């Protein structure tokens, strides 16, 4: 099952979905969401959150999954909030260890002077060859599968 979810995330990205969408939608059924719901709720996080090149969208998808698994549902649940923050921090550190950074611009090797644009690039063979995004999606999905396996889920 682990490999199927990882492959599904990569497949979704190669179909043209955003990095964040690909990670979340690969696990949608596990959390009771339809594919469409998962794609919509994670849509804004691609490209480093709204294509602003901040936190990697694949990592954002990973953190959304952490919220679905451990997020608190009571406003006064400080213990639950702390547990969720701890998990997100653990996942972020693992993502950084494997990929060298957490920030989209750093992962892409972009300079700070490049303008932020909202229009995505065409998904061509050249696009996939120059960007590490497929690897980020794969690693985020793998990290989540490993977490679930450790939890016996």
What are these regions (language model features)?
Residues 26-44, 113-118:
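Acidic-glycine-rich active-site phosphate/pyrophosphate-binding loop
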Residues 84-153:
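C-terminal binding/interaction regions
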Residues 53, 75-80, 95-96:
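RNase III-family endoribonuclease catalytic core
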Residues 1-15:
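Polybasic, low-complexity association/targeting segments
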Residues 30-40, 66-87:
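Phosphate-handling active-site elements
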